[in-house]
């Protein structure tokens, strides 16, 4: 299996390339309780239209082993830059889902030398009011492993039109997590502070699920309002919950393609 050594981390990744010269490179960061394969169908749609797509498992998720060292939004951002360095990619469009939707704007604000644009899919707006919920989640996983998450999230976190196969994949993603790694990534969200949204000067697309309870529309609108660039767009996906790329993959691909064409 393909791994990259990024500092002290061993990161499992995939690099999907189109035939011929790529129009642009995208790098994708998944969210809590997920893996690079959350994006698989989206990447195949984009590769078919000439884009290079890099996906990877966050440390402690999927096939990237947990290091037992605490992580943060900043260290996760460093991982993305490290992957780009290792693959000799000078600049890329960064895509982040959920927790990754905190990391992507952090990079857009602080590393615009490496970021072409940012796409935030169901981005979480860091909020102290969410801390008790994550503390309860950590306690449940410490006691019972990932089973409680797998028994609730696949139905609770999606929109009413989510296909059964999407729920099945969400369940598999959750059951496949290392509980210690999952807890570590919960703590990243607990400790997260809002990125410097006003500093962002690259184009930004936000995809918000109309029925998203994990990253509610109100928070997505708040992020949109705080983003500094005038080159920004908020798309509200009807009847979609928090797992956009599994619930409505074709729509996600079309929205990303449309946004990319607009910023050229």
What kind of feature is each model-predicted range?
Residues 128-132, 142-199:
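Conserved alpha/beta-hydrolase catalytic His-Asp/Glu region
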Residues 40-43, 48, 52-95, 254:
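Active-site loop/oxyanion-hole signature of alpha/beta-hydrolase fold enzymes
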Residues 240-249, 253:
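Catalytic histidine-centered segment of alpha/beta-hydrolase-like enzymes
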Residues 225-242:
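Catalytic histidine neighborhood in serine/cysteine hydrolases
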Residues 102-110, 114-148:
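Flexible "cap/lid" loop of the alpha/beta hydrolase fold
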Residues 200, 206-208, 212:
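Short beta-strand/loop motif that positions the catalytic acidic residue
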Residues 202, 216-225:
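Short alpha-helix in the alpha/beta-hydrolase fold that links the catalytic acid
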Residues 9-65:
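Conserved HGGG/HGGXW glycine-rich cap/lid loop of the alpha/beta-hydrolase fold
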């Amino acid at each position: 299996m393909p791994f990259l050594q990024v500092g002290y981390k061993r990161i499992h990744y995939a690099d999907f390339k189109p035939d011929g010269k790529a129009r642009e490179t995208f790098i994708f960061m998944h969210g809590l309780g997920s893996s690079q394969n959350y994006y698989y169908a989206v990447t195949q749609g984009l590769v078919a239209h000439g884009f290079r797509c890099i996906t990877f498992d966050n440390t402690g998720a999927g096939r990237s082993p947990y290091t037992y060292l605490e992580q943060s939004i900043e260290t996760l951002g460093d991982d993305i830059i490290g992957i780009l360095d290792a693959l000799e990619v000078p600049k890329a469009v960064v895509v982040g889902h959920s927790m990754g939707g905190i990391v992507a704007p952090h990079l857009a604000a602080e590393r615009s030398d490496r970021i072409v644009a940012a796409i935030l899919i169901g981005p979480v707006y860091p909020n102290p009011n969410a801390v008790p919920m994550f503390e309860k989640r950590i306690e449940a996983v410490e006691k019972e492993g990932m089973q409680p998450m797998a028994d609730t999230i696949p139905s609770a976190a999606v929109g009413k039109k989510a296909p059964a196969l999407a729920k099945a994949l969400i369940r598999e993603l959750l059951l496949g997590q290392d509980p210690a790694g999952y807890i570590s990534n919960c703590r990243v969200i607990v400790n997260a502070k809002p990125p410097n949204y006003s500093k962002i000067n690259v184009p930004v697309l936000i995809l918000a699920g109309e029925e998203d309870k994990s990253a509610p529309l109100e928070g997505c609108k708040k992020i949109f309002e705080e983003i500094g660039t005038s080159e920004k767009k908020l798309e509200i996906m009807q009847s979609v919950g928090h797992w956009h790329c599994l619930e409505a993959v074709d729509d996600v691909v079309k929205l990303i393609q449309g946004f990319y064409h607009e910023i050229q």
